[in-house]
Design a protein with these regions (language model features):
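Specific aromatic-rich, kink-prone transmembrane helix
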Residues: 103, 144-162, 175, 329-332
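Transmembrane-helix motifs of polytopic, lipid-linked glycan transferases
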Residues: 87, 91-113, 151
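Extracytosolic helix-loop segments that constitute the early lumenal/periplasmic catalytic or substrate-binding loops
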Residues: 18, 33-58, 65-68, 72-79
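Membrane-embedded architecture of ER/inner-membrane glycosylation machinery
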Residues: 3, 166-174, 207, 287-522
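Membrane-interface transmembrane helices that cradle and orient dolichyl/undecaprenyl
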Residues: 109-114, 152-171, 179, 289, ...
Length: 522
């Protein structure tokens, strides 16, 4: 029954991931870049097989693991003379990313054997978190990387309880390869986290067949290591740029654009995206520390501390860099959520885990959730007034979240376990319904509203073929390049054709799209 429930939650995540998947254009970072690299892989433009390019130049930012899968989808869904649709670009990352929902529950099942409630709660938390659901459906590497990391940890946990040591060793090796072919530098903290947890509990001593497990790992590592060796063989010292100049070296040493807040960026992302489960985290950290000698305590603390220690000091901080933190956060918070539902039953079912700390405060969390739900419903009412006009687009989200959280908090206060289960269902359904509404609207890709739309400008560039076009007054935009099917770099002076949203004097206008014009200037 546990596996059926986990599979059902995984199916729900897949349905959620596909809602409105192709309705909005690709955003600049990093969807349009990923799409272009995938298209050039499909077209075979590299100097050798499996070597990625971007506008016919070597692409040295990431290995082509996900790009290659997107290229396969493009081959299956797109005519050779067509630009691939947004749906075909986002499909592979969306499907792969939603696998973290059942895998997270399975991981918890291994950390807390027999604790079905905590396993299901882990999957529920991963299903309902906005950052996990939203970043997973973008044509980016972060969601797929989270799934690979979950399966890597799961395979390592299986080695001391399974007779199929070589199989699980191979799975661990393959997931290491997968991470090498996604964001390769992130493999280091993910592997260190697992190694710390294994060393803390000396778990490798109980592996059933260490030679078979290690052989499986080596075989599984072959694809990832093989590609990097192939890359180095063809491109020489340029291949090191993937690790140093444009990989770990850049994010460790160079404070890129949008990194003004430094280490606060991942903390802000967690504070913004962790609702409604975020209030459980402080209690969970204390509880896990009290039981740091248990497998759950060791792994959840080691993984969160190691990943947090790797992410917080980065000089370049972008919102999606915090994405790996959501898996250990879910592993930490889920047993507390299960305890809120089952209370005395939880300590009997998992006798090695005592009641959590500060129970008197923890038991007041349902009222807090209920209050948040009422506040959201109040904001929905305010949206009908003259002062709440800006809230109108969020009215439906406020209603479903408010009802879900208010009802969930109220039922979780009940003395009856059945009503408390209904409370968790209400909280979860409120979040899932809100995510479904969000993904069915233009609101889910809010970065598109932060600057001008590229598609009319791209159509203007496509309709007027000729010599190279430059973009005046703005930095180069990968999404404009994608839809224009040509690279349009920033204008830095001199004669030539240029796009601008300002009047272009002493130029020959070749086309107009709204306030934008394409002109040939001398």
């Amino acid at each position: 029954a546990t596996w059926i429930a986990l599979a059902t939650l995984g199916l729900a995540a897949a349905v959620l991931a596909l809602i409105g998947l192709g309705d909005l254009p690709l955003r600049d970072f990093d969807e349009a870049t990923v799409a272009r690299v995938a298209l050039e892989l499909h077209q075979g433009l590299g100097e050798a097989p499996l070597l990625p390019t971007l506008w016919d130049k070597p692409y040295l930012n990431k290995a082509p693991g996900l790009h290659s899968l997107i290229a396969l989808v493009i081959r299956a869904t797109t005519q050779s003379d067509e630009l691939p649709s947004e749906w075909s670009i986002r499909l592979a990352p969306a499907v792969l990313s939603c696998l973290v929902v059942p895998l997270g529950g399975w991981l918890q099942w291994l950390l807390r054997p027999g604790d079905r409630s905590s396993a299901l709660a882990t999957s529920v938390i991963l299903l309902t978190l906005l950052p996990v659901a939203r970043h997973g459906r973008l044509a980016m590497l972060d969601g797929t990387q989270l799934t690979a990391m979950a399966l890597l940890w799961l395979a390592l946990l299986q080695l001391n309880r399974s007779r199929s040591s070589s199989l699980w060793g191979a799975v661990a090796g393959l997931m290491t390869s997968a991470m090498l072919l996604l964001k390769a530098p992130l493999l280091v903290p993910a592997a260190v986290a697992a190694g710390l947890a294994l060393a803390w509990g000396r778990e490798w001593k109980s592996w059933n067949n260490r030679p078979a497990a290690l052989l499986g790992m080596v075989l599984g590592l072959a694809p990832g290591v093989g590609w990097h060796l192939w890359h180095a063989h063809i491109r020489g010292s340029e291949a090191l740029w993937l690790w140093g100049g444009d990989g770990a070296g850049r994010v460790l040493l160079d404070a890129g654009e949008g990194s003004d807040l430094g280490w606060r960026v991942p903390l802000i992302e967690v504070l913004e995206g962790g609702w409604p489960w975020l209030p459980l985290l402080p209690f969970a950290l204390v509880w896990a520390w009290h039981w740091r000698q248990s497998r759950w305590g060791r792994w959840s603390l080691a993984c969160l501390i190691t990943l947090g220690g790797a992410i917080l000091p980065l000089r370049t901080q972008l919102p999606w860099y915090s994405h790996p933190l959501w898996l250990p956060i879910a592993l930490l918070c889920a047993p507390l959520l299960a305890w809120l539902v089952e209370r005395p039953l939880a300590s009997k079912r998992a006798p090695e885990s005592p009641n959590p700390p500060c129970r008197w405060l923890l038991l007041r969390l349902p009222m807090f959730w209920c209050g948040l739900g009422l506040l959201l419903l109040l904001l929905e009412l305010v949206s009908f007034s003259s002062i709440g006009g800006s809230l109108v687009p969020y009215r439906g989200l406020a209603v479903v979240l408010g009802l879900g959280w208010c009802g969930g908090g109220w039922w979780l206060r009940s003395a009856a376990p059945q009503r408390r289960r209904l409370g968790v269902i209400s909280l979860s359904c409120g979040n899932v319904a809100a995510l479904a509404l969000l993904f069915h609207s233009p609101l889910w890709l809010w970065e598109l509203n932060e600057t001008w739309p590229v598609q009319p400008v791209a159509a203007l560039a496509r309709a007027n073929p000729g010599s190279k076009i430059r973009l005046k007054g703005y930095d180069e935009r990968p999404s404009l390049n994608w839809y224009a099917e040509q690279r349009i770099e920033r204008f830095k002076g001199g004669p030539g054709r240029r796009l601008s949203d300002k009047p272009q004097k002493d130029c020959i206008t070749e086309g107009q799209a709204g306030r934008w014009s394409l002109a040939n200037c001398r």
